[in-house]
């Protein structure tokens, strides 16, 4: 835009508002359209496939312009937000017909990926807005689902933990309360693909932010609230009091672990199907579905809480018919959490209140079912089923069950609720009869057989007279409009009736609106009780879902022990089993204790090593959620964390290879795991040379065995490592058995004691469909190699390095190299594998 160009007052208003929201698409209301200008118009036209036009087309520099109809704007807003953009909505704040000069406009809301509450693309899943603050090396993280008002805060000790928690929350927008470093911005923006927003102001709300929080936690929570108030510009009375949590209070799993175990989505397809969530989701309500995802994300480590959940599941299993009735009743429960939020936002529609009324009407039936069961395990759930009878009575008596559309469409309030409104409606009904009487009377008096009364907004009520009958028009008719083939007439009598009817209609519409707003304000008083009810319903729903799945999948109740024993008899991977359908799943048992806490697993690819490892992790997660588990019998310790390295593609976004990712994930395990953790490593070291890979694999096994003592499953293709069982007393060898007959190999998918004797790689290639000629050539090469002297070590390195003998050193007089001196000082047996790698890398630079 040229500086010398003259800007109209309207465009100047646009530019002034746009300057306040430079990082958002500004939808500028102009009549029946939201218009976009300049760069916003160009970019939005491309994204939304809009026609790009221009304002002042004859000017030297026309202003690019694009627009969307106001009544269809939501779908365009949803698309922009879904793609990670912010959208600022500038509305007309006065009637353009009564405006003096430029119509007053203001931004009434900024919709962002983290604050969206009613997008058609949102679904029932939680949508978290995350805020962070920093003080030294300490971080605080606060997050909220604006659509439900749930509000949380925690502290983290380092940047890695912070990023891990943000990933776990699957956040799309991050509110930052401190000055970011370039490295942090690179991680958040490029690697984690977050929309970054910044907030300096802290909202101090004693109703929401507890004084028991640390100052840093208060700052993070307060900045999140401040950002919300700045962008939403509406009532947020549905926000719940912030809940402080500690990450260590739950079974800890990082994002990579959850992805590799297919907990919330299938890691290969990105879809729900084939995930643990898919298996367990027999919920019937939106609240239950969200809570189930939370429970999968955060299994418990508190035995009492786990056993409380198990007890309810057992009750629901014992009372099949009552559970069936409960399931039917839950189907009539709507999303109370989001309905309550819509009340707070002032966006409640008649259908929302009807859904709320229907839900409250179902609560007594649900409560009665649980009371009939009369089991102590259900006591707290029964107590939490508050039917709020006074609210149900208000809505059911006030809102017409056939009410449709918006609050200005009329016919919302039930007949009999308000006497004055009933009188207005009576006038409108009787007026219709009066008009019919006038029409019949004038038709007979005039002799115009096709005389009729019609209505439109411009002319109101009128007599429609065709040109052929104009000679018969009575003298007391007065002309209202002339058309090509007819004319429209009125009479004083018709005008009087019309006036009464229109007055009654307008007063009726205004009164209905007032009544609806009063009801909405009354409903707002119950938001807290509705949210508590929603939590109870969600818990009941998830636990009945656990019972349904336990029955369908033949699951058993796991027992927990503090003796560090892990025994699973004929365990199964329930997700794989369900996906297989009618095919037979081969179960496997596992026993680990203080004497044997590591298994080294060998066997061919595709034989089931990874499934066996995942099976154990999924059973642990299900058990600590309070669910039953797929086994004939299960006795488990309570784990504090699960660490995995089970397959992954190269991390192309961050520029890290498969091997680097392997080492980073292995390093995380050896640094953070305890003797109460579960470690699952699959083919660790495969991403580098044979010597390097086997050396690292052995060193990591030894470190976990000697220093950590965590329950560990370690699958490897390095057959030489099986000899470690001779020196590591807590390690045992197991393998996936095969049946070889007449040159054909069958994978039995059964875990057996001892190491595998072959890898069967060529057979796997055959299954994959490799050409026969290629396979025959590979077999000949294999036989040749097997007959030659081995080029790789046939045994692992000794667990303890022997001291040198007394033999003379030919180079004894050679001066020592500084690198050798530093190398000699390294205490490698008290270092993690990653620390050894980093030290060697530094020494290489000095050579």
Curated annotation (Swiss-Prot):
Q: Which PROSITE patterns match?
A: DNA_MISMATCH_REPAIR_2
Q: Give one GO term, molecular function aspect.
A: mismatched DNA binding
Q: Looking at the record's lineage, which domain of life comes first?
A: Bacteria
Q: Tell me the SMART domains matching this sequence.
A: MUTSac, MUTSd
The record's section on InterPro entries has: DNA_mismatch_repair_MutS, DNA_mismatch_repair_MutS-lik_N, DNA_mismatch_repair_MutS/MSH, DNA_mismatch_repair_MutS_C, DNA_mismatch_repair_MutS_clamp, DNA_mismatch_repair_MutS_core, DNA_mismatch_repair_MutS_N, DNA_mismatch_repair_MutS_sf
**Which Gene Ontology terms of cellular component type are present?**
cytosol
Q: Which residues bind ATP?
A: 603-610
Keywords of this entry = ATP-binding, DNA damage, DNA repair, DNA-binding, Nucleotide-binding
Chain's role: This protein is involved in the repair of mismatches in DNA. It is possible that it carries out the mismatch recognition step. This protein has a weak ATPase activity.
Which Pfam families has this protein been placed in?
Answer: MutS_I, MutS_II, MutS_III, MutS_IV, MutS_V
GO BP annotation list? mismatch repair
Protein's recorded name: DNA mismatch repair protein MutS
Q: Which family does it belong to?
A: Belongs to the DNA mismatch repair MutS family.
């Amino acid at each position: 835009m040229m500086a010398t160009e003259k800007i109209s007052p309207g465009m100047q208003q646009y530019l002034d508002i746009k300057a306040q929201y430079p990082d958002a698409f500004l939808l500028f209301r102009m009549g029946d359209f939201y218009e976009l200008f300049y760069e916003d118009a160009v970019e939005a036209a491309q994204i939304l496939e809009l026609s790009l036009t221009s304002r002042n087309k004859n000017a030297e520099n026309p202003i690019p312009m694009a627009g969307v109809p106001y009544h269809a704007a939501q779908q365009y807003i949803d698309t922009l937000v879904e793609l990670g953009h912010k959208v600022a909505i500038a509305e007309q704040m006065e009637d353009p017909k009564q405006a003096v000069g430029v119509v007053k406009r203001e931004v009434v809301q900024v919709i962002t990926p983290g604050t969206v509450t009613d997008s058609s693309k949102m679904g029932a899943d939680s949508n978290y807005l995350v805020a962070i603050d920093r003080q030294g090396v300490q971080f605080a993280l606060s997050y909220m689902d604006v659509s439900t008002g749930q509000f949380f805060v925690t502290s983290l000790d380092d940047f890695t933990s912070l990023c891990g928690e943000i990933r776990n929350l699957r956040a799309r927008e991050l509110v930052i309360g401190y000055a970011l470093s370039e490295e942090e911005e690179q991680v958040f923006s490029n690697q984690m693909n977050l929309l970054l927003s910044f907030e300096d102001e802290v909202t101090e709300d004693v109703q929401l932010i507890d004084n028991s929080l640390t100052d840093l936690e208060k700052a993070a929570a307060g900045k999140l609230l401040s950002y919300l108030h700045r962008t939403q510009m509406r009532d947020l009375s549905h926000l719940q009091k912030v809940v402080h949590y500690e990450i260590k209070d739950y079974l800890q799993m990082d994002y990579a672990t959850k992805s590799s175990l297919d907990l919330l989505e299938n890691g290969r397809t990105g879809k729900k199907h084939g995930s643990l969530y898919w298996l367990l989701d027999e919920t019937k309500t939106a609240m239950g579905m969200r809570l189930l995802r939370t429970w999968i994300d955060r299994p418990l480590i508190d035995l009492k809480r786990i056993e409380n959940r198990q007890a309810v599941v057992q009750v629901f299993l014992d009372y099949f018919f009552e559970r069936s009735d409960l399931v039917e009743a839950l189907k009539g429960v709507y999303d109370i959490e989001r309905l309550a939020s819509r009340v707070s936002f002032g966006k409640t529609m008649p259908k929302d209140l009807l859904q709320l009324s229907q839900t409250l009407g179902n609560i007594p039936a649900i409560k009665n079912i649980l009371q009939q069961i009369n089991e102590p395990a259900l006591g707290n759930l029964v107590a939490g089923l508050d039917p709020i009878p006074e609210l149900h009575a208000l809505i059911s008596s006030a809102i017409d069950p056939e009410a449709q559309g918006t609050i200005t469409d009329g016919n919302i309030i039930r007949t009999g609720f308000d006497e004055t409104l009933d009188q207005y409606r009576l006038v409108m009904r009787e007026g219709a009869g009066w008009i019919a009487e006038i029409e019949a009377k004038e038709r007979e008096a005039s002799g115009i057989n096709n005389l009729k009364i019609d209505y439109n907004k411009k002319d109101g009520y009128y007599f429609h007279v065709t040109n052929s009958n104009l000679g018969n028009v009575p003298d007391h008719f007065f002309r209202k409009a002339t058309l090509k083939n007819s004319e429209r007439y009125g009479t004083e009598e018709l005008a009087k009736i019309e006036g009464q009817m229109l007055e009654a209609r307008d007063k009726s519409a205004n009164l209905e609106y007032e009544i609806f707003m009063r009801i909405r304000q009354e409903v707002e008083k119950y938001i807290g009780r509705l949210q508590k009810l929603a939590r109870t319903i969600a818990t009941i729903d998830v636990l009945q879902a656990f019972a349904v799945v336990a029955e369908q999948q033949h699951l058993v109740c796991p027992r927990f022990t503090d003796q560090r024993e892990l025994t699973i008899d004929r365990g199964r991977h329930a997700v794989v089993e369900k996906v297989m359908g009618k095919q037979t799943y081969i179960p496997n048992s596992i026993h680990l204790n203080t004497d044997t806490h590591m298994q080294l697993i060998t066997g061919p690819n595709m034989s089931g090593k990874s499934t066996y490892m995942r099976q154990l992790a999924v059973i642990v997660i299900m058990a600590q959620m309070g669910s039953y588990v797929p086994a004939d019998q299960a006795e488990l310790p309570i784990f504090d964390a699960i660490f995995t390295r089970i397959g992954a593609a190269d991390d192309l976004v961050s520029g890290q290879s498969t091997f680097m990712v392997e080492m980073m994930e292995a390093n995380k395990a050896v640094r953070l795991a305890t003797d109460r953790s579960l470690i699952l490593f699959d083919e660790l070291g495969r991403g580098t040379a044979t010597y390097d890979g086997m050396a690292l694999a052995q060193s990591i096994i030894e470190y976990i065995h000697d220093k950590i003592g965590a329950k560990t499953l370690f699958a490897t293709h390095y057959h030489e490592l099986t000899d470690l069982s001779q020196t590591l007393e807590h390690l045992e060898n197991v393998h996936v058995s095969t049946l070889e007959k007449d040159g054909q190999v069958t994978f039995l998918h059964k875990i057996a004691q001892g190491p595998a004797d072959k890898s069967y790689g060529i057979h796997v290639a055959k299954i994959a469909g490799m050409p026969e000629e290629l396979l025959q050539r590979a077999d000949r090469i294999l036989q040749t190699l097997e007959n030659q002297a081995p080029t790789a070590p046939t045994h692992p390195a000794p667990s303890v390095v022997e001291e040198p003998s007394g033999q003379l050193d030919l180079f004894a007089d050679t001066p020592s190299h500084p690198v050798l001196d530093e190398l000699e000082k390294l205490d490698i047996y008290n270092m993690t594998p990653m620390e050894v790698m980093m030290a060697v890398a530094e020494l290489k630079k000095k050579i």
